[in-house]
């Protein structure tokens, strides 16, 4: 299902002085139509920290990516920190929630999935992305489970380079870095 609205109140929009669409309404209409153009899927496996997911919701709304959350979630969708981080972009993000990893996989039939982990074998910028690919990320405190990570061939296990001795990057930062590289490779299709 595309553009599943989240349980947030709709923002109030202003009308132009002539009674036509105001600038804010035009931006809303533009985002709503863009929302139906899905290039990539972002899959968060059991995310734990609301502000990270809120930031990723905003990222997905602005890039045309679909967000898939796999339960259990470490928060409720109405969490104030999640709402604050996502600003007023929640209703423009295409999102679905899956009961478990198998349920998510059933919806991804025939699509390539890249697992992003500190234990990934290939640098994210060396992967070759195409429209329709999905990017999978694990929970903030522990990353992807070993069995899920090992179910991917090495070319689909990606990592973001860090200096020696670093443990991990922030989840929302990592998603942004990898998603923008994937989008860059398809020449920022649909970007202004």
What are these regions (language model features)?
Residues 1-36:
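Intrinsic disorder/low-complexity segments
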Residues 14, 27-192:
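Post-transcriptional modification and biogenesis factors for structured RNAs
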């Amino acid at each position: 299902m595309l553009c599943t609205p989240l349980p947030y109140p709709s923002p109030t929009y202003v009308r132009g002085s002539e009674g036509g669409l105001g600038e804010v309404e035009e931006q809303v209409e533009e985002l709503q139509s863009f929302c139906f153009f899905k290039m990539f899927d972002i899959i968060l496996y059991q995310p734990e920290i609301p502000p990270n997911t809120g930031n990723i919701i905003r990222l997905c709304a602005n890039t045309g990516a679909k967000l898939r959350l796999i339960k259990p979630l470490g928060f409720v969708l109405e969490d104030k920190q999640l709402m604050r981080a996502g600003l007023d972009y929640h209703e423009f993000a295409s999102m679905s929630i899956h009961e478990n990893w198998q349920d998510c996989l059933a919806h991804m039939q025939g699509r390539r999935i890249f697992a992003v982990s500190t234990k990934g074998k290939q640098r994210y910028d060396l992967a070759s992305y195409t429209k329709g690919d999905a990017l999978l990320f694990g929970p903030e405190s522990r990353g992807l489970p070993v069995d899920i990570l090992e179910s991917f061939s090495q070319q689909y296990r990606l990592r973001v380079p860090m200096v020696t001795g670093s443990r991990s990057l922030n989840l929302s930062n990592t998603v942004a870095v990898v998603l923008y590289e994937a989008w860059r490779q398809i020449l920022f299709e649909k970007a202004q």
